[in-house]
């Protein structure tokens, strides 16, 4: 899909660059593969804001996407490529030989009428899924599982991919878009190809209202708040904050390391921060 720019006939059109979605399905999604989506406005079960800058936006239906791809050795044909408001990638509706319908993430170069299949060892072509144990080294993949059978978790956003670079003692080594080199079990599934819609990051929405339609609220600077709301708040007139930049909870926000170690850190061979100074 190409980018589409607009003539500045109004201020909101000036600089507007959007994805040309003219080739996507224009109808409704399959009713049996959608469910209602309740808006949280960024609040958790106690009513407190746990994710800032969320709220409002157009009503959505959640498309149930198959991230597991565990229907082995049953070919499926791509019926259509669809827009999904819940993710940056496009999704593909596939019909299996036994008649079952499912949504999968659409990789680049997947077209209507193409055949896809999941299995222990399949052809290396976009949309086919297999475990790393049956995959040749060097393959570009997406929708990578971290735990066998859990479903794909890595490389699911538009244009992303990982590369299978080696095997080591029952583990597969993969290089992620961030530069991180990590290991996952060879039994983990992955889908061949890079995720569709690679130009997503080149869009310019042109006006605040389009971001509000997407459910994104304004980002307020700490120095513009009151002292009760942020450590940088308050003061007479405009101030610089008066201290090193911190989050609303007082943690350093410009490069300070605040994350705790996780058990899965031992599977990271090379950190995505490896090139940074002092890492």
Curated annotation (Swiss-Prot):
Keywords noted in UniProt: Ribonucleoprotein, Ribosomal protein, RNA-binding, rRNA-binding
Lineage per the UniProt record: Bacteria, Pseudomonadati, Pseudomonadota, Alphaproteobacteria, Rhodobacterales
Basic residues: bias regions: 269-279
Assembly notes: Part of the 50S ribosomal subunit. Forms a bridge to the 30S subunit in the 70S ribosome.
Annotated GO CC locations: large ribosomal subunit
Single GO MF annotation: rRNA binding
Name this polypeptide is given: Large ribosomal subunit protein uL2
Species in which this protein is naturally found: Cereibacter sphaeroides (strain ATCC 17023 / DSM 158 / JCM 6121 / CCUG 31486 / LMG 2827 / NBRC 12203 / NCIMB 8253 / ATH 2.4.1.)
UniProt entry tagged with the keyword Calcium: no
Annotated function: One of the primary rRNA binding proteins. Required for association of the 30S and 50S subunits to form the 70S ribosome, for tRNA binding and peptide bond formation. It has been suggested to have peptidyltransferase activity; this is somewhat controversial. Makes several contacts with the 16S rRNA in the 70S ribosome.
Residue numbers spanned by region Disordered: 224-279
Alphabetical GO biological process terms: cytoplasmic translation
Spans through the membrane: none
SUPFAM superfamilies: Nucleic acid-binding proteins, Translation proteins SH3-like domain
Taxonomic superkingdom: Bacteria
Cited HAMAP family: Ribosomal_uL2_B
PROSITE patterns: RIBOSOMAL_L2
Family: Belongs to the universal ribosomal protein uL2 family.
